[in-house]
Regions:
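Carbohydrate-active catalytic/glycan-binding domains of CAZyme proteins
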Residues: 1-286
Length: 286
């Protein structure tokens, strides 16, 4: 099938052995009951095979709705899926799943969510620092605190659990491209993704709502590490109703930003945008 035919949010692409693996929030009702996750495979980012079922919840699984934003990470020879889940009366959280193949089947690896159990959280991603120490970077959701934040916590080396408390880094309202005119005063944080530039700068991409709709931009760590402090780029990368993105390098060596756009269901699709790494930051290729 064509990429334009795949309804998907929060796209995440991994290039393995000459094949593009596309993960994301799939299904025609991601806002309701969760059924699992599917993936797709492509040679050219235009034509895809699939869907391939990569995760289906076991009977008694703790969550039953809002199965969101699966990211597949290669780590120490294993394939790990970071994904967010929700149930009535239970805070949304990011759990870690594991498989021996990029198409799964993925099974529970952490004991429930790794994110704080009393926080409404989503969109956990893996960051491994220069010493090989793993962290989860995630969103503390606006539905609980109104001005959503980005936070991180250290992980055990086997990715089974948190190895320390969560630390909040910055709030959505600190972004100059955030929609500060929102009448109810809420500010969204979505989809953090860490990237080290060719010049050694550590960037964090994340999404919120700007004046023209859903938008994605980035912050720069002034220390070069996960602890920050984090300073925003003045302008977003994309602010026309698209976001929750990540970066990957295609077969030709071109850096690609993938986002979903538009941001309305059921019309969301994966979009692939060429990006220039300037050493200090990122710009979209004209």
């Amino acid at each position: 099938m064509l990429c334009s035919e795949i309804q998907i949010r929060d796209p995440y692409v991994v290039l393995l052995d000459g094949k593009y693996y596309l993960y994301g929030t799939t299904g025609n009702n991601c806002w309701g009951k969760g059924y699992g996750f599917d993936a797709y495979i492509s040679d050219d980012l235009t034509h895809f095979d699939g869907p391939f079922p990569i995760f289906r919840p076991r009977p008694g699984f703790w969550a039953d709705k809002n199965f969101w934003a699966p990211e597949m990470h290669l780590y120490r020879g294993g394939y790990y899926l970071f994904a967010s889940f929700k149930a009535d009366g239970v805070c949304r959280g990011t759990q870690i799943l594991r498989a021996d193949h990029p198409l799964g089947p993925f099974e529970e690896w952490s004991d429930g969510p790794v994110t704080p159990r009393d926080w409404e959280c989503l969109d956990g991603t893996l960051y491994v620092d220069g010493d090989g120490k793993p962290y989860m970077v995630f969103c503390h959701e606006w539905v609980q605190i109104k001005d959503g934040t980005i936070a991180y916590l250290p992980l055990t080396d086997d990715l089974r659990a948190a190895a320390g408390p969560a630390v909040e880094l910055f709030a959505a309202s600190s972004a100059p491209w955030n929609n500060h005119d929102d009448p109810d005063g809420t500010h969204v944080t979505d989809g953090p993704f860490l990237y080290r530039t060719s010049g050694g700068k550590l960037l964090m991409l994340w999404s919120t709502f700007g004046k023209h709709g859903y938008a994605i931009g980035y912050y720069v760590s002034q220390s070069g590490g996960i602890e920050g402090p984090w300073v925003p780029a003045e302008q977003p990368l994309f602010d026309r109703d698209g976001g929750h993105g990540m970066l990957f390098t295609d077969k030709s060596g071109q850096l690609i930003l993938t986002i979903h756009s538009p941001n309305d269901t059921p019309n969301e699709r994966a979009v692939f945008l060429p990006v220039i790494d300037t050493g200090d930051g990122l710009t979209l290729r004209a």
